[in-house]
Amino acid sequence: MNFFKIFIVIAITASSIAFAHSGVKDKNVKERMMLMKAMADNTKLIGQILKKQTPFELNEVKQALEKLSSLSLQTPTVFEVNATDPKSEAKQNIWDEFDEFTKLSNELAKNTSELANLVENIDDLRPTLMKVSEGCKACHSKYRE
């Protein structure tokens, strides 16, 4: 997957999440959406640094990756309640396959934490962002409308 495709996926995800929040009535769904928005924001920051729209600061990149790891670990918790809302993009199979959903989330947490320890300079960002995007896509392609 090339960088342009990754950036488009991030941009679409961030904009659809922001739009989706308006009018959400179920508190569980809103909590899930807020967590996903935080994940998108951290991923977007890395993309902006890679595109040189934001200056490279190693500590910021590491913090964004650690935050992604933490949010990934929280993801199964916010999906424990099978709550619905017309604005929700969560597919029913999340709860039908909750162990697999949790496994994918935990893998993303592990990978982003490892990446936070490996990234050293701006040249490391492209493969880092690709790895993060692959983890997001693994879950979204299966469990998101």
Feature locations, PLM:
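Sequence context surrounding c-type heme c attachment/ligation sites in exported
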Residues: 22, 26-145
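N-terminal signal peptide c-region/cleavage motif recognized by signal peptidases
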Residues: 15-20
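Sec-dependent signal peptide recognition
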Residues: 2-10
